Amino acid sequence: MNLYKKYQGGLAVWLESSNHKDIGTLYFIFGLWSGMVGTSFSLLIRLELAKPGFFLSNGQLYNSVITAHAILMIFFMVMPTMIGGFGNWLLPLMLGAPDMSFPRLNNLSFWLLPTSMLLILDACFVDMGCGTSWTVYPPLSTMGHPGSSVDLAIFSLHAAGLSSILGGINFMCTTKNLRSSSISLEHMTLFVWTVFVTVFLLVLSLPVLAGAITMLLTDRNLNTSFFDPSTGGNPLIYQHLFWFFGHPEVYILILPAFGIVSQSTLYLTGKKEVFGALGMVYAILSIGLIGCVVWAHHMYTVGMDLDSRAYFSAATMVIAVPTGVKVFSWLATLFGMKMVFNPLLLWVLGFIFLFTLGGLTGVVLSNSSLDIILHDTYYVVSHFHYVLSLGAVFGIFTGVTLWWSFITGYVLDKLMMSAVFILLFIGVNLTFFPLHFAGLHGFPRKYLDYPDVYSVWNIIASYGSIISTAGLFLFIYVLLESFFSYRLVISDYYSNSSPEYCMSNYVFGHSYQSEIYFSTTSLKN
């Protein structure tokens, strides 16, 4: 059935809709658009670093491109797609709910995001741009940027943060209050668990960021001195406040991908539940809890005392335990399955392998003595891109491969989707693996020129980014081709216990008109 057959009411249907499926679709479209813009900025970065010398006119412009790339990818690509897109579409279906708890608030949450995106793009193009990186540290963001660019970036972060807080409250209330009475907490799917913990982290950490950037705004415009040491302030306070948000944000980005991969392993194997399902739930909760108390591992170089560094090193290493539980549970779930050619299997295995590799470099960086040496080098850049570019983004591709036919009623071309995986797998590895070695040799972040000794690693990385971009274009073609070829889903052979598949028609406005009861004997995950 055509997904858009019911959308005959023109633009007003999209602007005013309070239906969770319509809003989820809007989030997907917005996330795809933002991802393309963010990828364009990343390509500019790699073109600048492709060889020694200058491609962009100056370092301020280069740092503005870095800021735009980071904020676009984090706040406008990964979060809207993972939480807004997959969360809106699937959470009510998996809970047996007719819609989200606050449908109009859901609509507001989405429309705050395009506003926020316009503000951050404005910030990059006025007054020489916002060259502060996404961290917006003072005094670079105060005395170093006297123009209006940082003010626009702060308002952008406020709008995006408000969107996420309102959406988070909505998801929490939906999970608590609209869950079918037949679904107890232990019977919720792992995707619902990951979204629930994610939005809890959002509601906990985003007000802290809002406070920090509001103080920064008053420092810039109202002559306060929260972060100005010459008048009794302390810029270190800003770092603590920012990273109290910034580190949970990393888990906000990756946790929904964990849920998607868990659902994908069930789909691939046909098993009733993931291996160690209760252990997986506790691992999700542990990651969320520990992620809130390790923020200062981003700040080893600020001069913390030995006891603080010892604590934050140890606590950071502890996160590897629940993460390891999840990885081995996925592998144990996949164990014994019939190996058939399936692009979904490629994405799942690619995610597990590459996320694990990124996690290993994270264990290296958790050691404060090593991190002081490697801080602000490309080793750190490679680490968090392995976790995000090859973790969260591969999670998004996994989710699209898994649920595309469920959401749209059309089938993706398996061969071309496998080609997308191969291009992206080769491209992102070629981009970020060599940069580990550049970082170990001391190549610093946020510099637009470098000595010739680093040129080999950077040339390889730039070729990799071109391959990745080609993979993205092919992915967009695959999505369009599935519509144009009109390959409809005839029936889904999936006979597992995941609740969303009990829907006979995927495009009704409200899926459940009355309360639905699931059999808890079959609904084990």
Curated annotation (Swiss-Prot):
The chain crosses the membrane at residues 25-45, 71-91, 108-128, 152-172, 190-210, 241-261, 274-294, 317-337, 344-364, 387-407, 420-440, 459-479. It holds the Pfam family COX1. Mg(2+) binds at H375, D376. Its cofactor is heme; Cu cation. It is found in: Mitochondrion inner membrane. This is Cytochrome c oxidase subunit 1. The gene is ctc-1. Pathway: Energy metabolism; oxidative phosphorylation.
